[in-house]
């Protein structure tokens, strides 16, 4: 996973699609500091740049943090933020220009066609995709539809182990210390797993998220349409 993450990050940088904000995980307890030390060892083994920081060093990178309640932090300067919509748009454009990719926008998938002979595992071979604009013959179909992927997979009598979940996040701001950066994100993302929270800059505001809640699963059929 570390190698996959590094390769993905490098690809986004090569395409000028990422912003290297850096990321810091802070520790409030000695047990957490011990975990960060273990993580430092793993980062070194994988060749990923990382640093263990004392509270004062964390404060230098994130001036609005209260250094009195932490013992230190694990800093990875190559943590980056990527706009998924922009990234998909740029990759699609390059695929069209360089590889002859065909794109059919605003096209609804109605069904996945399969042959009549089950394989030993009980599944059938894909033969095509039915859309509201016609049928496309295909030997392979890649399902990459986010939270709606299972709806497509069901059409081929298969299943993708993916369940959407609601995540809690609060937007705080605007804050002068953030607005003065004139960036979408100018400070490192901070994770505080002793409280199961994290924060990240969003232009002049701060987004604070929490993992300290029960899992809130959400069926894709209940997600409102953009229309």
Language-model features: locations:
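Dinucleotide-binding Rossmann-like beta1-alpha1 core, especially the glycine-rich loop
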Residues: 1-61, 194-199, 203
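Well-ordered beta-strand positions
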Residues: 18, 113, 130, 137, ...
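Short aromatic/hydrophobic contact patches that present stacked aromatics
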Residues: 23-27, 73-75, 169
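Conserved hydrophobic/aromatic beta-strand scaffold that supports enzyme active sites
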Residues: 25, 128, 169-171, 189, ...
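Conserved beta-strand segments of alpha/beta enzyme cores
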Residues: 49-51, 102, 159
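Helical element adjacent to the flavin cofactor pocket in flavoenzyme catalytic cores
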Residues: 74-140
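Central helical "cap/lid" subdomain
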Residues: 131-186, 204
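Active-site lid/adjacent beta-loop-alpha segment flanking the redox-cofactor pocket in flavoenzymes
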Residues: 158-159, 175-227
């Amino acid at each position: 996973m570390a190698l996959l993450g590094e390769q993905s990050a490098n690809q986004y940088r090569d395409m000028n699609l990422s912003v290297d904000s850096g990321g810091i995980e802070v520790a409030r307890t000695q047990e957490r500091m011990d975990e960060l030390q273990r993580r430092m060892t793993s980062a070194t083994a994988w060749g990923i740049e990382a640093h263990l920081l004392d509270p004062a060093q964390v404060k230098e990178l994130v001036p609005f943090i209260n250094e009195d309640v932490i013992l230190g932090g694990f800093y990875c300067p190559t943590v980056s933020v990527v706009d998924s919509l922009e990234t998909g748009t740029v990759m699609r454009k390059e695929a069209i220009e360089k590889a002859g990719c065909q794109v059919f926008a605003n096209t609804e998938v109605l069904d996945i066609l399969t042959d009549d002979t089950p394989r030993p595992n009980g599944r059938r071979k894909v033969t095509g995709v039915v859309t509201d604009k016609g049928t496309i013959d295909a030997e392979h179909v890649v399902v990459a539809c986010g939270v709606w992927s299972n709806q497509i997979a069901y059409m081929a009598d298969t299943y993708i182990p993916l369940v959407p979940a609601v995540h809690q996040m609060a937007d705080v701001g605007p804050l002068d210390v953030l607005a003065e950066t004139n960036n979408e994100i100018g400070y490192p993302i901070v994770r505080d797993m002793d409280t199961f929270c994290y924060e990240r800059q969003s232009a002049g505001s701060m987004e604070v998220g929490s993992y300290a809640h029960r899992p809130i699963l959400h069926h894709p059929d209940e997600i409102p349409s953009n229309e």
